[in-house]
Structures are given as C-alpha cells and as structure tokens.
C-alpha cells in the first residue's frame, strides 16, 4: 500500500540553532540549504517537521 508522501525542503540555516533542531534536520535527510526530500506522511515525520517548521517548507506530493 503506497501511502501519502510529503515534499520537504530546507529553507533555513541550522547555524545558531539548538543541537536537537540540527539533529532533527539530519534525521529528515536535510543537511544543506534548498535540499528537498520526499518522505512518508507518518505521525513521526509530522512531529519532526513541526519541531523545525521555521526552517522547512512542506508540500504534499
């Protein structure tokens, strides 16, 4: 069963952010500006996105 996916793009820099926010970006596969990843739409991924919502842009794919 193919679930919904989210297109997540990093738009903010992790410089001068807390260590847990940087780790969350890495967990999402985002470690460079303007990098885009397609991730499964799960509650875990949504929680990670919410934690760094000021540094990412989310589109439904």
From Swiss-Prot:
InterPro entries in the cross-refs: Ribo_uL30_ferredoxin-like_sf (IPR036919), Ribosomal_uL30_bac-type (IPR005996), Ribosomal_uL30_ferredoxin-like (IPR016082)
Q: Name one GO cellular component term.
A: cytosolic large ribosomal subunit
Q: Which GO terms describe its molecular function?
A: structural constituent of ribosome
Please give the Gene3D superfamilies that the UniProt record associates with this protein. Ribosomal protein L30, ferredoxin-like fold domain
Disulphide linkage map:
none
Q: Name one Pfam family in it.
A: Ribosomal_L30
Keyword list (alphabetical) reads: Ribonucleoprotein, Ribosomal protein
Q: Name one GO biological process term.
A: translation
Task: State how it assembles.
Answer: Part of the 50S ribosomal subunit.
Q: Name the HAMAP family on file.
A: Ribosomal_uL30_B
Hey, which family's this protein in?
Belongs to the universal ribosomal protein uL30 family.
This protein is called Large ribosomal subunit protein uL30
Species source reads: Rhizorhabdus wittichii (strain DSM 6014 / CCUG 31198 / JCM 15750 / NBRC 105917 / EY 4224 / RW1) (Sphingomonas wittichii)
Q: Which gene encodes it?
A: rpmD
């Amino acid at each position: 069963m193919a679930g919904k996916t989210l297109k997540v793009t990093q738009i903010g820099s992790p410089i001068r952010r807390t260590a847990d926010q940087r780790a969350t970006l890495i967990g999402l596969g985002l470690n460079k500006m303007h990098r885009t990843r397609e991730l499964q739409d799960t509650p875990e991924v949504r929680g990670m996105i919410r934690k760094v919502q000021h540094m990412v842009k989310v589109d439904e794919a």
